[in-house]
């Protein structure tokens, strides 16, 4: 590995660990922060040498390895490198090789999983190895061995206290575990070598390092608020469960089987009890009073939003913060971030008139006063979740977001000048859209017409039709089903350049897949195929990747664009795409690049970002820092987009 003419040693590594904390539930930062955390096996590979394994239940981590962790001459590489980097950080802190607030520098690390995800490949080591057909596959015995050696046993009647299985308890399995650990390094190395021909941009590694720093900083938790909310929630749940038992006469109303049978007995059978369906049934006003009472109570019990307070407590580290809330390249194809743990990108909004009063009542655990003033205790708790994430002492949170970023980006790509003019001037995109659609002057757009412009703007930009309008809630906005086809036609007639952009992108992909070569479109977009991937190069220089793309003849005689990718459910599968969907990927990926570059500028300017939500950056700054400078820095577009 060479950088700037100097040779850098490549150090591939993989570890097996033990902690009493549950990794999937609390994340790697809290998992490694637990006092019981240990690294029990270490396997590594230097450049092209053989894999070495160190049994850390018998030996210590070699001194040279500890030195290498902070030596920039070694490039550390792992699959999901955040796990190794955070784990080794905890160990180096214990050894006083790092300060209590220091983290291993992510700029010295490379993550093979990120390389795979950038190419639209599986995020699972096993799945990626199988898909790529590398000769070193992941050892399938790992799940059982991890469960045995790396997690505490679950309490049973015979063994009421959990215990830890040690190597001496199963020496043969321990030898298998060491072999499994070593094989993971071989598999990771094989994947890394396979992907080396398609290099990840240096700028993307800068962004990954920034992402790691954001996760390292963490977000402070308002502990009294979380504690108060949990107390109120548990008390309310006990009351609601007792009430539900009284209404239904069931021993266990949580049992779907029992509750469905009870509903059938009441003459109101419901085969599915999802939140949306239950709410729809309640809104219909056709349910018998007792059934409505039972279902309303069940909704209160199933309020998953308030469970986020429990996550704040469970995932909080000793520094009072929750770390690891965002995953880099979590969305394949676009490269957008994905939420983890608290899912900060999906927190309920708040519209309470007096947040400070509501917060003080929750901290005082005064459910009676909350009920008296607001009437709906679970709803108040739900609305206050956002306020449970706070600034550090002596700091405040400052926020800036990109307004209607996708509408701006798609108009910029397509050259839809009237939309761009609206953003350059008054910024009222919904009114401007309605004006274009219905040929009505802006100053005569009423509330109902604006609503049509709004739902059309939000739903139709990516070749959506009537179904997209319905999914966006058009029928709940006062529109009738008969109006929807006309709304689609009017929007497309008003946005001819965007419509043309859909078909230009589709033709570009079809041309590349059928005849090869390179197709260039406006704003520097470039479509080409290389090493079994379709690539779309963005103005930022980043490439969107689609694995094993091809044109497939459908029964209707038309060609469809297909590729291998992650479906909505677990597993890699064959997926279809089309012009509007390709445009959606391009637009969302470009919006991601704009936010990513903005966060680099904010960090460089003394605004350390601690989290970001969709197109909004949140920085934790000392009291006295203003928002104006942050907004100026964030709004300064990259050179490629000027």
Predicted regions and their residues:
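Conserved catalytic palm subdomain of right-hand nucleotidyl-transferase polymerases, strongest
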Residues: 12-13, 79, 109-111, 391-405
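Active-site palm subdomain of RNA-directed nucleic acid polymerases
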Residues: 195-207, 594-617
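Short, conserved charged micro-motifs
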Residues: 624-632
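Conserved RNase H-like, two-metal-ion catalytic cores of nucleic-acid enzymes
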Residues: 1-123, 352-355, 359, 411-413
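A common structural junction motif
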Residues: 477, 634-641
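Generic long, charged, amphipathic alpha-helical segments
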Residues: 429-448, 554-610
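Conserved "right-hand" nucleotidyltransferase catalytic core of DNA-directed polymerases
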Residues: 2-17, 21-23, 34-36, 41-43, ...
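A short acidic-Thr-Gly-centered motif at the start of a beta-strand
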Residues: 1-9, 66-70, 380-396, 600-604
């Amino acid at each position: 590995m060479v950088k700037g003419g100097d040779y850098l040693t490549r150090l591939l590594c993989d570890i097996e660990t033990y902690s009493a904390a549950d990794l999937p539930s609390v994340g790697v930062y809290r998992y490694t922060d637990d006092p019981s955390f240990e690294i029990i096996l270490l396997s590594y590979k230097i450049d092209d040498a053989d894999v070495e394994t160190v049994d850390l239940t018998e030996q210590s981590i070699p001194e040279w390895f500890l030195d290498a962790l902070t030596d920039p001459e070694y490039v550390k590489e792992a699959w999901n490198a955040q796990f190794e980097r955070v784990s080794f950080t905890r160990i180096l802190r214990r050894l006083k090789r790092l300060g209590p607030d220091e983290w291993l520098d992510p700029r010295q690390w490379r993550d093979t999983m990120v390389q795979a995800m950038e190419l639209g490949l599986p995020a699972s080591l096993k799945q990626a190895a199988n898909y790529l057909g590398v000769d070193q596959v992941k050892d399938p015995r790992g799940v059982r061995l991890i469960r045995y050696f790396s997690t505490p046993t679950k309490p049973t009647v015979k063994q009421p206290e959990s215990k830890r299985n040690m190597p001496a308890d199963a020496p043969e399995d321990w030898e298998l575990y060491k072999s499994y650990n070593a094989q993971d390094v071989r598999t990771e190395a094989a994947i890394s070598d396979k992907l080396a021909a398609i290099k990840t941009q240096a700028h993307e590694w800068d962004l990954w390092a920034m992402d790691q720093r954001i996760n390292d900083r963490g977000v402070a938790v308002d502990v009294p608020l979380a504690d108060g909310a949990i107390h109120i929630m548990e008390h309310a749940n006990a009351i609601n469960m007792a009430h539900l038992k009284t209404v239904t006469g069931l021993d266990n109303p949580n049992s779907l089987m029992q509750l469905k049978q009870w509903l059938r007995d009441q003459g109101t059978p419901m085969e599915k009890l999802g939140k949306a369906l239950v709410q729809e049934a309640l809104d219909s006003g056709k349910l018998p009073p007792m059934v409505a009472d039972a279902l309303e109570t069940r909704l209160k019990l199933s309020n998953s939003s308030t469970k986020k307070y429990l996550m704040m407590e469970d995932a909080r580290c000793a520094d009072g913060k929750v770390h690891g809330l965002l995953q880099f390249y979590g969305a394949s194809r676009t490269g957008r971030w994905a939420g983890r743990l608290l899912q900060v990108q999906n927190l309920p909004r708040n519209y309470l008139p007096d947040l400070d009063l509501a917060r003080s009542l929750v901290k005082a655990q005064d459910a009676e006063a909350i009920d008296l003033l607001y009437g709906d205790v679970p709803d108040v708790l739900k609305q206050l979740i956002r306020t449970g994430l706070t600034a550090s002492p002596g700091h405040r949170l400052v926020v800036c977001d990109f307004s209607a970023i996708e509408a701006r980006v798609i108009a910029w790509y397509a050259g839809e000048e009237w939309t761009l003019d609206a953003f350059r001037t008054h910024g009222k995109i919904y009114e401007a859209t309605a004006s274009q659609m219905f040929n009505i002057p802006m100053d005569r757009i009423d509330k109902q017409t604006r609503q049509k412009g709004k739902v059309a703007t939000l739903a139709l930009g990516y070749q959506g039709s009537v179904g997209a309008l319905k999914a966006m809630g058009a029928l709940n906005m006062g529109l009738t089903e008969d109006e929807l086809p006309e709304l689609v036609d009017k929007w497309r007639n008003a946005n001819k350049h965007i419509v043309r952009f859909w078909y230009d992108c589709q033709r570009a992909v079809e041309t590349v897949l059928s005849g090869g070569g390179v197709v260039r479109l406006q704003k520097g977009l470039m479509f080409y195929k290389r090493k079994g991937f379709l690539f779309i190069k963005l103005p930022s220089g980043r490439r969107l990747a689609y694995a094993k793309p091809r044109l497939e003849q459908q029964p209707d005689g038309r060609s469809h664009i297909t590729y291998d990718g992650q479906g909505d459910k677990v597993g890699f599968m064959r997926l279809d795409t089309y012009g509007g969907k390709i445009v959606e990927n391009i637009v969302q990926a470009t919006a991601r690049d704009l936010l990513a570059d903005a966060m680099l500028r904010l960090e460089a300017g003394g605004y350390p970002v601690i989290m970001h939500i969709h197109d909004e950056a949140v920085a934790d700054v000392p009291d006295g820092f203003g928002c104006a400078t942050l907004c100026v820095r964030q709004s300064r577009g990259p050179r490629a987009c000027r």
